[in-house]
């Protein structure tokens, strides 16, 4: 790579000590550093003219909720008249231009190039997901955010981080003066309360929020949850009360909405404008996304929930809707291969604990044997049931699992297909094939109603999202 870069005009190479030995014959200076990734962000920012300094940057981190909160932020910024950009898991938006997203937070040279393009296009504010991988690798170096939000921290990515504390420390890096001017923290999460302590110790301005009655600067009260949206009252630090809404179901989306509102309000956006803009957002790709056909009779949604906590939270949010319709709550879910193995039994346990029926299926097995992954998931389910009647079945083929769940659903029921959300491919044995849960679910609904073809892989979908990071 380095010789090719030099041939293309590079005037110097940044490398580490091992690389310096291999590249000793190059006719350009070698800048030897201990951590190449650690300096790449600052170098890239310099090369591209420090684009983040010309943008109002908003960063969101947490195991769950980053994508939704970023889209809600974007809604508020647009309502305030800003030209906006969004960088995250689903896609990259530069104004109204859509760019495919390979990872949650791009590598630092790519990220700085994207920000430079945003400046050229007249973008004024950017909402950005910041993953623990990005913080560990220094991808966000060269950016100082107007505001950053901490949403939550739960089991995930222990295939990458040494342990849970290492995962926390990676997230905590975002809440230092190097990265942020002000922090907005959910203190319903115990790790959020630790982040507050870090902020105060580091001299970072911090604003807390809660949707569960924990003492905080901002809170959501009078929460009313419906199948498609939620309404609530924002209680500001001065005690004033403001009606608000989130165009997404679930109390966790009230938390996401409140996070976005607070980020905007403490960064100079008028509170009523922030509330209205967040309420403008009625749907985020693959996040509690409703799929329906005429005469369906039951609620069916696709969600990205792919951690034990996310599955539990999603099911807890949908349970009242099933009870309201005197129906059953059913979940289709699996676990990805070549990733955090410790969460597999926990996923199975969460599914059988909160659903009336769980259908365990393939997610992205990648290089692993599907049966081994499903065995770990069902082991967790069996342990949770502790001899009680089995309320799950295994259907390895994902399209068949979705078709079964649709056929089993009756009026008043609620069905959630969890784990892949917006993804448009499935990786099995190193081969990526088109697969979109939304397309497959719709086909299954139409087939069950006798109005369409049998559910397949969703071959209409194109592309394949890369590795997800939290």
Name each region found by the language model:
Residues 1-42, 190, 221, 241, ...:
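N-terminal leader/targeting and accessory segments in enzymes
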Residues 1-61, 68-81, 217, 226, ...:
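Short, basic phosphate-binding NTP loop
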Residues 7, 11-17, 183-187, 332-333, ...:
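Short internal beta-strands
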Residues 15, 19-26, 121, 127, ...:
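Acidic, Mg2+-coordinating active-site environments of NTP-dependent enzymes
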Residues 17-20, 89-90, 132-133, 153, ...:
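Short, ordered loop/turn segments at secondary-structure junctions
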Residues 39-187, 193-202, 454:
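Phosphate-binding loop of NTP-binding sites
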Residues 78, 203, 239, 249, ...:
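ATP-dependent carboxylate-amine ligase
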């Amino acid at each position: 790579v380095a010789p090719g870069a030099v041939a293309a005009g590079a005037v110097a190479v940044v490398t580490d000590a091992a690389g310096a030995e291999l590249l000793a014959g190059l006719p350009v200076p070698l800048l030897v550093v201990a951590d190449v990734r650690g300096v790449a962000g600052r170098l890239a920012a310099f090369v591209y003219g420090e684009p983040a300094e010309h943008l109002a940057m908003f960063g969101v981190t947490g195991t769950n909720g980053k994508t939704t909160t970023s889209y809600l932020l974007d809604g508020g910024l647009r309502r305030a008249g800003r030209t906006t950009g969004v960088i995250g898991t689903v896609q990259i938006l530069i104004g109204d231009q859509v760019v495919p997203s390979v990872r949650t937070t791009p590598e630092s040279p790519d990220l700085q190039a994207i920000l430079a393009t945003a400046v050229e296009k007249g973008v004024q504010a950017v909402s950005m997901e910041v993953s623990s991988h990005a913080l560990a690798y220094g991808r966000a170096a060269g950016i100082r955010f107007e505001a950053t939000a901490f949403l939550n921290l739960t089991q995930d990515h222990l295939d990458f981080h040494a342990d849970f504390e290492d995962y926390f420390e990676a997230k905590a890096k975002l809440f230092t003066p190097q990265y942020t001017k002000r922090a907005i923290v959910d203190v319903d999460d115990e790790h959020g309360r630790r982040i507050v302590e870090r902020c105060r110790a580091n001299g970072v301005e911090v604003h807390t929020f809660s949707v569960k009655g924990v003492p905080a600067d901002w809170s959501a009260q009078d929460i009313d949850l419906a199948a498609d949206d939620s309404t609530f009252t924002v209680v500001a630090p001065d005690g004033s009360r403001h009606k608000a809404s989130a165009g997404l179901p679930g109390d966790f989306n009230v938390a996401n909405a409140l996070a976005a509102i607070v980020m905007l309000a403490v960064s100079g956006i008028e509170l009523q404008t922030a509330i209205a803009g967040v309420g403008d957002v009625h749907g985020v790709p693959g996040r509690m996304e409703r799929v329906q056909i005429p005469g369906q009779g039951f609620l069916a949604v696709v969600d990205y929930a792919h951690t034990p906590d996310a599955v539990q939270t999603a099911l807890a949010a949908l349970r009242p809707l099933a009870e309201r319709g005197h129906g059953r709550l059913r979940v289709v879910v699996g676990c990805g291969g070549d990733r955090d193995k410790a969460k597999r039994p926990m996923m199975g346990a969460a599914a059988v604990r909160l659903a009336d029926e769980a259908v365990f299926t393939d997610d992205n097995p990648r290089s692993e044997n599907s049966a081994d992954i499903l065995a770990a998931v069902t082991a967790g389910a069996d342990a949770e049931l502790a001899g009680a009647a089995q309320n799950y079945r295994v259907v390895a083929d994902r399209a068949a699992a979705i078709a079964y769940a649709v056929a089993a659903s009756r009026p008043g029921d609620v069905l959630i297909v969890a784990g892949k959300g917006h993804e448009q491919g499935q990786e099995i044995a190193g081969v990526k094939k088109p697969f979109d849960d939304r397309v497959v679910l719709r086909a299954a609904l139409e087939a069950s109603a006798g109005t369409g073809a049998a559910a397949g892989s969703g071959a209409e979908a194109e592309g394949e999202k890369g590795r997800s990071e939290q």
